[in-house]
Regions:
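Non-heme Fe(II) oxygenase catalytic core, chiefly the N-lobe of the double-stranded beta-helix
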Residues: 1-106, 117-128, 135, 139
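Amphipathic alpha-helical scaffolding segments comprising HEAT/armadillo-like alpha-solenoid repeats
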Residues: 188-199, 217-229, 248-259, 278-292, ...
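A general structural signal for short secondary-structure boundary/capping elements
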Residues: 50-58, 70, 155-162, 371-375, ...
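Short inter-helical turns and helix N-cap capping residues of alpha-solenoid HEAT/ARM repeat scaffolds
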Residues: 202-204, 231-232, 261-262, 294-295, ...
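Short, charged, solvent-exposed linker or helix-capping segments at domain edges/interfaces
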Residues: 18-19, 33, 145-147, 381, ...
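A conserved hydrophobic position in a structured secondary element of the catalytic/binding core
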Residues: 23, 112, 382
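Non-heme Fe(II)/2-oxoglutarate
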Residues: 111, 115-197, 207
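Structural detector for internal amphipathic alpha-helices that build alpha-solenoid repeat scaffolds
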Residues: 168-187, 205-217, 234-249, 256, ...
Length: 422
């Protein structure tokens, strides 16, 4: 768990005010069938939605009118494709039935995993203001030992549901990760063939748990690599979970893939290496090199991954620092954001005059995530000029009054300020 969110309610929030809700234990499931069905439904609705977007940009339609128009577009799509609409509704209901509404008095704080499924629970029937502030917390470093009053190294499974039993390999791996152990030493007794069948199951829990089981043996990792390299986008992400869990065991298989010509494949490999973190430090050099790729997608993942992989190094190379200096000036907003993120992770180990200059300049960036990570990074450099710039900025702003200008759909194209919002 590298990211945690905190939800804060500044007012009393009841069920009839439309609170936020979460789906417990959903953070490790990709919801493939739901997302695929929803994506197809959105694709069929795209023409109507684009028309509404264009009218909003031209200011010939109000936001209130657009809400009604969007509902009308989806209704029309459902009438034209009733079977798809029925399937979509059925799949969504399976998740909606597991939702837990977050209600409470003013001052309520809720801490949740960054990837947990969360959304509005219901409409605001009272019409009263219902504000909620989100805070994002990030680890400075992956754990090397327990951070709590820890006595028993064994994982204790409190729940006895079928779902919890299926997901036990996942919980056990995460438990070991939080203890600072590199990977689980528990050997699987399930055959690789049986696990392969489970990996290909449409049930997310069965598939993900199988990937974690396969990660425990060399034969299993070979199978995960084969699937990871396949054209089956439905299974590649599941295989990636297993390769992350395999840690150092997967590095010899991933190393030859970093130099492939396909930028999408290279990006996927680097993404896994970043998820593995410090245990992947033997491949840090090619990841640093990839940070100057012509592909914006590869640059994004590489610039982020260097901060995760190098976090436990005593000293960072000049080549790494130069790539981060360049990242802060990249034409792509996501690369600049990830550059600031990695600098915040690595702190004074990557401090240079150009790093400080770049971060100070990016305090005025159009993308709110670039601004946010830049101010965070300046405070972690242990540099007098950086700290003075951070204090000056915080004194002037106190609160970021700029709009969330970076909330745009991320594509494989360079993101610029002047591009139309999509």
């Amino acid at each position: 768990t590298r990211y945690v969110m905190m939800f804060y309610y500044p007012q009393d929030t009841t069920l009839d005010m439309g609170p936020t809700c979460v789906v417990p234990q959903s953070q490790y499931l990709p919801r493939r069938e739901v997302e695929q069905t929803r994506a197809e439904f959105d694709r069929l609705s795209r023409a109507g939605l684009n028309k509404i977007r264009d009218q909003l940009l031209a200011k010939t339609m109000t936001p209130q009118e657009s809400e009604k128009a969007v509902k009308a577009v989806y209704k029309e799509t459902a009438e034209k494709h009733p079977e798809l609409a029925k399937k979509n509704k059925t799949l969504e209901k399976l998740w909606k039935d597991k939702r837990v509404p977050l209600v409470g008095p003013a001052g309520t704080l809720v801490f949740v995993h960054f990837d947990i499924v969360h959304a509005r629970y219901s409409s605001n029937e009272l019409g009263l203001p219902r504000h909620m502030v989100k805070f994002l917390f990030t680890r400075n470093n992956d754990p090397v030992k327990p951070s709590w009053n820890h006595a028993d190294p064994d994982w204790k499974q409190e729940e006895t549901s079928v779902s919890s039993e299926i997901m036990k390999p996942v919980w056990l791996d995460l438990w070991n990760w939080h203890l600072g152990n590199k990977q689980s030493n528990e050997n699987t007794i399930t055959s690789v063939k049986s696990l392969c069948d489970r990996l290909k199951d449409s049930n997310d829990e069965l598939a993900v748990s199988a990937a974690y089981e396969l990660a425990k043996s060399d034969e299993g990792v070979e199978l995960l690599i084969e699937i990871f390299n396949s054209d089956d986008t439905n299974l590649r992400s599941i295989a990636a979970y297993g390769l992350r869990a395999a840690g150092q065991r997967s590095l010899d298989y991933l190393a030859p893939l970093i130099d492939k010509e396909d930028p999408q494949k290279v990006a996927r490999v680097i993404d896994v290496l970043g998820d593995i973190g410090p245990p992947a430090d033997s491949l840090l050099e090619p990841v640093i090199k990839a940070a100057s790729s012509q592909s914006v997608v590869v640059r994004r993942y590489a610039v982020e991954a260097v901060g995760l992989i190098a976090q436990q190094q005593v000293k960072c190379s000049r080549a790494l620092i130069e790539q981060l200096e360049n990242a802060l000036k990249d034409e792509d907003a996501i690369v600049r954001r990830n550059g600031a993120f990695s600098i915040a992770q690595l702190g004074d180990k990557v401090c240079s005059e150009l790093v400080v200059d770049g971060l100070i300049e990016n305090l005025q960036d159009w993308h709110h995530h670039v601004r946010g990570w830049s101010i965070e990074a300046l405070q972690r450099l242990e540099n007098e000029r950086a700290l003075k710039a951070a204090i000056k900025y915080l004194n002037h702003t106190r609160w970021d009054a700029y709009p969330k200008s970076g909330d745009r759909t991320v594509t494989d194209q360079v993101m610029r300020l002047e591009d139309p919002v999509r």
